[in-house]
Every structure is written in C-alpha cells, then in structure tokens.
Design a protein with these regions (language model features):
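Channel- or pocket-lining gating/hinge segments that regulate access to a cavity or pore
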Residues: 170-172
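C-terminal binding/interaction regions
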Residues: 164
Length: 220
C-alpha cells in the first residue's frame, strides 16, 4: 500500500508488541487488548479518522448516511476509528462502506461497537477490528453524531490525526505529539530483538540471551 506519510510507513514496519514496549519505556498508555481481527484481516496502521455514533437526531445539515463522510476524508494513510458504545445493537459499519473504503485505499477500520456484513469485509480483504458483530441495521436506531472529533474507544480517547496500529495482539493509539519518539523507540527495540535472535541462531543458550538483554531492554 502506497503511503505519503513517512511515519505511517515506518509504523507499518512494526508490530503491536514492539510499539507496546516502546510505550512502556516512555511511560505512555494507549494499548487496548482483546479486540479481534475479522478473519483474514492483516496488521494495519495509519492516521486516525474518527466517527461517533449514537441514538438520537443527527446534527443539522443535509442528511448523509453514516460513515460516508469519513470514507470521503480517507486516503491510504488513514484508519477509520468508530465509537458506538450506546449499547444499542446496531451496525456502526457494513459491507458497502468497507467496499467504498477499500476503493479509496483506506487501511482499515477499528470499531468499538457492533459491525455487520463482516463476511463481506473478509471476502474483499478489508481489515476490520471489533469486539462485536451484528446483523441489525443502523436505520432508525443510531445516527452519526460527529466526524473527526475526539472519540473514546476501548477506554482510550483518541483524536483525528493521531495514529493507530492494530494486529492480532492489540490495538494501540499514539498521539500525534508522541508518534515520532514512539516509532523511534520501537525501532530501537526491534533492532535489539534482532540481535538476540541472531545470537540464538548462532548457538548462544537462550537463558544467556534473555538474561543479558531482555530484562533490561526497556531501561537502556
């Protein structure tokens, strides 16, 4: 996937475990665990576009189907992040939106709320991360309250323009203010782990490798 954002390019070369270790080293939070990938999804990373959905009346202005504004804002450096924590069993994302997002090149979706048409998303190879699935439509149940305003997903508040990485281990949010030092630290950790792996392959006993490196990796 082509990206114009160098930070996104570097973030996509990492995984959530390395980024989580970097957050630990820097004393930062932002890790959400237990958020499954839809079957067939892959690791994603990018800049955050937010959506907030809830029951009630939509904001003033011409009516638009939920999700369409976020998709139109998106590009290959983007991940759409959705807050739909109302408790209403209604889809905050669906198959046509996944298709439109895939056509735009958007990296994927992270949703704190029920997602529908998950089989369609899987079949087209569009990554979706969510804890909840449903068949129920949003129509007459929830509306889009805001786009690119702060949202809270899985207990973590994130803003448009922040960064997110998601894989089988976790979903991690990093503020725009901290992204450069987090990526740099994660790259350093990956480099140290590569040297450890090289030592194991060369025959160094694993207890020696782990004792001399692993326990002190986040301190040095």
């Amino acid at each position: 996937m082509t990206t114009k954002d160098e930070i996104v390019h570097r973030l996509r070369r990492l995984d959530c475990c390395a980024v989580s270790d970097a957050l630990d080293k820097l004393g930062l939070s932002g890790v959400a665990t237990g958020v499954p990938q839809a079957p067939g999804s892959k690791r994603i990373a990018g800049r955050v576009i937010t959506m907030k959905l809830a029951p009630g009346e939509p904001p003033p202005g011409p009516p638009r189907h939920l999700g369409t504004t976020a998709v139109e804002f998106g590009d290959p450096d983007s991940v759409i992040v959705i807050e739909q924590t109302s408790g209403v069993d209604a889809g905050c994302w669906g198959g046509i939106l996944s298709l439109a997002a895939k056509v735009k090149g958007i990296a994927g979706v992270v949703a704190d709320g029920p997602v529908r048409d998950i089989d369609e998303s899987r079949e087209m190879g569009f990554p979706v991360f969510t804890q909840k699935l449903t068949s129920r439509t949003a129509r007459s149940r929830i509306v889009e309250k805001a786009v690119n305003e702060p949202v809270t997903v899985f207990g973590i508040t994130t803003n448009a323009g922040d960064y997110v990485i998601a894989d089988s281990s976790a979903v991690i949010f990093i503020s725009a203010a901290n992204i450069a030092k987090v990526v740099e630290t994660a790259e350093m950790i990956v480099g140290k782990e590569a040297l450890m792996a090289k030592a194991v392959l060369a025959g160094t006993p694993v207890h020696e490798v782990m004792a001399s490196n692993y326990e002190f990796m986040l301190k040095g």
